Design a protein with these regions (language model features):
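Short alpha-helix C-terminal cap/hinge motif
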Residues: 1-13
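Generic structural signal for residues in well-ordered beta-strands
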Residues: 12-14, 117, 194-196
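Short low-complexity, flexible loop/linker segments enriched in glycine and/or proline
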Residues: 28-31, 192-194
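Solvent-exposed polar/charged
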Residues: 6, 110, 137, 189-190
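Extracytoplasmic ligand-binding site segments that recognize negatively charged/polar headgroups
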Residues: 1, 17-21, 27, 33-173
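Histidine- and/or cysteine-centered catalytic micro-motif in compact active-site loops
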Residues: 122, 180-184, 199-201
């Protein structure tokens, strides 16, 4: 941000919120907008914002090079990255319990993970809704509901933010979480003792966007 201000002379006030919180704020400020640019988060919530008339079309320079499936045809949002979901697990927890990094959704049902999982809340987080999409793709509608009920028994906390669980895992305050890959990579790059892995059953992914 400092470099951007230096290059352009434009001062930036940056506020990080979960995608659900961003959408709620856009809806509340519809008649008196307080935000100029939305950076990051999955495309889903910006589709809602577009349909509710909360955002305006804008075509960024260079966006012609981005494949059509990764941007809105009316230029209401533009994809800037692909975000698959990933498991992030604390290495000390794995060593203590003689476990390998999880490679299946079923691994999270093991007794060792009791009150050790931290997951985002689907009422506020795009990461959480992506998790629910993944579970439905893997287990079917009723199967995903049944699995989520079992999974809930091992969850210590649900958070507003989709990124925050990764930090708690890094700090050792939770055993594992399911987050978007960029949030997991941030924790790895900061030097926390964590392992990133993926469920063999597969995951869905989000398109990270700017609007």
């Amino acid at each position: 941000l400092e470099q951007f201000t230096k290059d352009t002379g434009i001062k930036v006030n940056f506020l990080r919120l979960s995608s659900g919180e961003v959408l709620s704020r856009l809806q509340a400020e519809k008649n008196n907008p307080q935000v100029d640019v939305l950076l990051g988060g999955p495309a889903d919530y910006l589709e809602v914002a577009k349909n509710e008339g909360l955002t305006a079309p804008y075509k960024p320079k260079g966006s012609d090079f981005i494949p059509a499936e990764f941007k809105d045809p009316q230029n209401y949002w533009t994809g800037i990255g692909i975000m698959p979901l990933a498991f992030i697990t604390n290495n000390n927890f794995l060593k203590k319990n003689n476990l390998k990094a999880p490679t299946s959704w079923q691994d999270f049902l093991k007794p060792e993970y009791k009150e050790g999982l931290i997951l985002a809340d689907a009422r506020t987080s795009g990461t959480a809704t992506e998790r629910l999409f993944s579970l439905e793709r893997v287990f079917g509608r009723q199967g995903s509901i049944d699995f989520q009920k079992k999974l809930h028994k091992n969850v210590q906390m649900y958070t507003k933010s989709g990124a925050w669980p990764a930090l708690r895992v890094g700090d050792g305050l939770a055993a594992a979480a399911m987050v978007y890959l960029p949030d997991a990579l941030d924790i790895v790059q900061l030097g926390y003792p964590v392992t990133i892995s993926y469920p063999k059953e597969g995951v869905t992914l989000g398109i990270e966007v700017v609007s």
